[in-house]
UniProtKB/Swiss-Prot annotation:
Catalysis performed (reactions): succinyl-CoA + L-arginine = N(2)-succinyl-L-arginine + CoA + H(+)
Name of the protein in its database record: Arginine N-succinyltransferase
Binding site for succinyl-CoA: L125
Keywords, alphabetical: Acyltransferase, Arginine metabolism, Transferase
InterPro entries documented for this protein: Acyl_CoA_acyltransferase, Arg_succinylTrfase_AstA/AruG, Arginine_N-succinylTrfase
Pfam families per the UniProt record, alphabetical: AstA
The enzyme's E.C. designation: 2.3.1.109
A single MF term (Gene Ontology): N-succinylarginine dihydrolase activity
Protein family (similarity comment): Belongs to the arginine N-succinyltransferase family.
UniProt source species: Yersinia pestis
Nucleotidyltransferase keyword on record: no
UniProt xrefs under HAMAP family: AstA (MF_01171)
C-alpha cells in the first residue's frame, strides 16, 4: 500500500537516492547529504513547534509499505522570505510614448520582486520515475492541501508554487544564458545548486535592481518565460486543476512560472470534509468499500502522526467504511474522524 507520512530521520538514505534522480533545475532537493539531513531536522523541529514561522517547513514522504521504501517527497514552506529574501521576476510593462513623434509603445519587462514574502509555498515535489503511475503523482502533490485544510491555522492566506523552468537535455537553460549568466558569470547548474543549499546571498548582491527589457533577451529565452520543463508539465496541470494560476511571476534562474491562489479557494482545502471511521472487511456486496468507486484522498487528523492514503469508495453518509488494512495504514480506530476529498474535481475525468 502507498501512504504519505511525515519524514523521519531513517528516510535520509532513500531521499538522498531520490535526489540523484532529479536532474538540473530542482533547487530544493540537491544531492547533498548534509543539506538533506538538515532539511529533515528542520521538518522535525517544525512539527515540534520549536521554530519561528519563517524557518518552518513540513516535509512529507510517499512510502511503498510493501517495499518499505520512500519513493517520493513533497513539502510545504510555512512563510517564505521572512528570514532570507524571496526573489522572483514580475513580468510587467513599461510604456514609452511621445506625442510629438506620435509614438506609443508598451514594452514587456522583468522586475526583481519580493511580492510573495510571507506566503506559504508548495515545494520539493519529486516522485521516483518507476512510481509515476496509479495516480501517485496527484496523490503526493494534493495531500499537502489536505494537511493544510486540517491544520489551516499554521498557513498563510495565499499559497504559491514555483515550477521548474525549461532546460534542454544537456541541462542548459536558455533563460539563464540570456539573463543570469551576465550578472553571475557562473554556470546555471552551479547557481542552481548554491540556491538549493541555502547559499543565496549572491542573489541579492548581484541581481539587477532595475527592470530588464524582455525584447533585449535572446528569442529562445523570451520563448521560455513562464514555461515549465516537460517533466514538470503534469505537476503544473495538477495544481491548476486545484485552482492555482500563473499571475506573471517567474523564477530568476530559469524563468519557470510561479502559480498562486488564495489558500481557502483551493479545491481540496475548500471541499474536504470529515467522516467518522467504521471498520469492516471488504465484502463483494458492500457498496461503500468498492474498488470501482470514486478515488478519494483520506487522511487522519493527527498532527504529529499524519497519515494519508488513496482509496476507492462511495460516500453515502457521515461515516467512512475502512478495511482493517486501510485503518492500520491511517493509524485510526473505529469512531475516529478522518478528512476526505475526491482526488479529482467531480467534473474532471481521470
Amino acid at each position: 500500500m502507498m501512504k504519505v507520512r511525515p519524514v523521519e530521520r531513517r528516510d535520509l538514505a532513500d531521499i538522498f537516492e531520490l535526489a540523484g534522480k532529479t536532474g538540473v533545475g530542482m533547487t530544493s532537493l540537491p544531492q547533498n547529504e548534509q543539506h538533506l539531513a538538515a532539511r529533515i531536522e528542520r521538518a522535525l523541529n517544525t512539527w515540534q513547534g520549536s521554530l519561528d514561522p519563517g524557518e518552518q517547513g513540513y516535509l512529507f514522504v510517499l512510502e511503498d509499505s510493501e517495499q518499505q521504501k520512500v519513493v517520493g517527497v513533497s513539502a510545504i514552506e510555512v512563510a517564505v522570505g521572512l528570514n532570507d529574501p524571496w526573489y522572483n521576476f514580475r513580468v510587467g510593462t513599461l510604456v514609452h510614448a511621445s506625442k510629438a513623434l506620435n509614438v506609443y509603445k508598451s514594452v514587456p519587462t522583468l522586475f526583481l520582486s519580493n511580492d510573495h514574502t510571507g506566503y506559504s509555498e508548495l515545494c520539493t515535489l519529486f516522485l521516483d520515475p518507476d512510481y509515476r503511475k496509479d495516480k501517485n503523482g496527484p496523490f503526493l502533490s494534493k495531500v499537502r492541501f489536505l494537511f493544510i485544510a486540517a491544520f489551516r491555522q499554521y498557513f498563510s492566506r495565499k499559497v504559491i508554487a514555483e515550477m521548474r523552468g525549461y532546460t534542454d537535455e544537456q541541462g542548459r537553460s536558455p533563460f539563464w544564458e540570456s539573463v543570469g549568466r551576465h550578472f553571475f558569470s557562473i554556470e546555471f547548474a552551479k547557481a542552481d545548486y548554491l540556491s538549493g543549499t541555502g547559499q543565496k546571498a549572491f542573489i541579492a548582491e548581484l541581481m539587477p535592481k532595475h527592470p530588464l527589457y524582455v525584447d533585449f533577451l535572446a528569442e529562445e529565452a523570451r520563448a521560455v518565460i513562464g514555461q515549465v520543463h516537460p517533466h514538470t508539465a503534469p505537476a503544473r496541470a495538477v495544481l491548476e486543476t486545484e485552482g492555482l494560476q500563473y499571475q506573471g511571476y517567474v523564477d530568476i534562474f530559469d524563468g519557470g512560472p510561479t502559480l498562486e491562489a488564495n489558500t481557502d479557494d483551493v479545491r481540496v482545502v475548500r471541499d474536504s470534509s470529515k467522516r467518522t471511521v467504521v471498520i469492516k472487511d471488504y465484502d463483494i456486496e458492500d457498496y461503500d468499500i468498492d474498488p470501482n468507486g470514486r478515488l478519494y484522498l483520506v487522511a487522519n487528523d493527527h498532527y504529529h502522526h499524519f497519515r494519508a492514503i488513496l482509496m476507492n469508495t462511495h460516500l453515502s453518509d457521515e461515516r467512512l467504511r475502512l478495511t482493517p488494512e486501510s485503518a492500520e495504514a491511517l493509524g485510526v480506530a473505529a469512531g475516529d474522524s478522518v478528512r476526505i476529498v475526491s482526488l479529482f474535481a467531480p467534473e474532471t475525468k481521470r
